[in-house]
């Protein structure tokens, strides 16, 4: 009887961990889609001289990026063979945070070339992380 209970408990824990991993992947996919949307809005804002679109894009990127300030979240979404890159992902999220704050400051000062440079820093941070985590 005890063996059966232990087997059921073990099976339940396995199912729970698989479901949790699947949930983490879904959350990560949604965050990435929303960050992409924010980046696209920033770029469109620069192309069409639309400050409101730039600002809303920056706000969206900042909001979604907050997810990656938590080490446990990062660990849950990194592939098993990339778990050691947790610090890189955390550093990247801080780079994005700094670049978005810098971008807001430059926009407030009407220094659009510098604001666009900050946008490039955001995209470069994303690319650096994706390069290492995805093994590009």
Predicted regions and their residues:
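Basic/polar N-terminal segments that are highly enriched at the extreme N-terminus
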Residues: 1-2, 19-23
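Bacterial N-terminal signal peptides that target proteins for export
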Residues: 1-10
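Hydrophobic h-region of N-terminal signal peptides that target proteins for export
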Residues: 12-20
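Processing junctions and N-termini across compartments
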Residues: 15, 120-123
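Extracytoplasmic c-type cytochrome modules immediately beyond a signal peptide or single-pass transmembrane anchor
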Residues: 22-121
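Aromatic-residue hotspot detector
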Residues: 72, 133-136
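The canonical Cys-X-X-Cys-His
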Residues: 122-134
């Amino acid at each position: 009887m005890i063996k059966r209970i232990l087997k059921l408990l073990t099976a339940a824990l396995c199912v729970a961990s698989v479901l949790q991993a699947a949930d983490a992947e879904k959350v990560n996919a949604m965050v990435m889609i929303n960050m992409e949307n924010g980046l696209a809005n920033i770029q469109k804002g620069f192309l069409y001289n639309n400050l409101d679109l730039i600002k809303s894009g920056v706000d969206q990127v900042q909001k979604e990026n907050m997810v990656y300030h938590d080490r446990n979240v990062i660990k849950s979404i990194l592939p098993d063979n990339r778990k050691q890159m947790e610090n890189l992902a955390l550093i990247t999220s801080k780079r994005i945070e700094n670049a978005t704050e810098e971008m807001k400051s430059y926009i407030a000062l009407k220094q659009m070339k510098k604001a666009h440079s900050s946008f490039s820093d955001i995209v470069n941070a994303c690319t650096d992380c994706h390069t290492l985590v995805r093994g590009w």
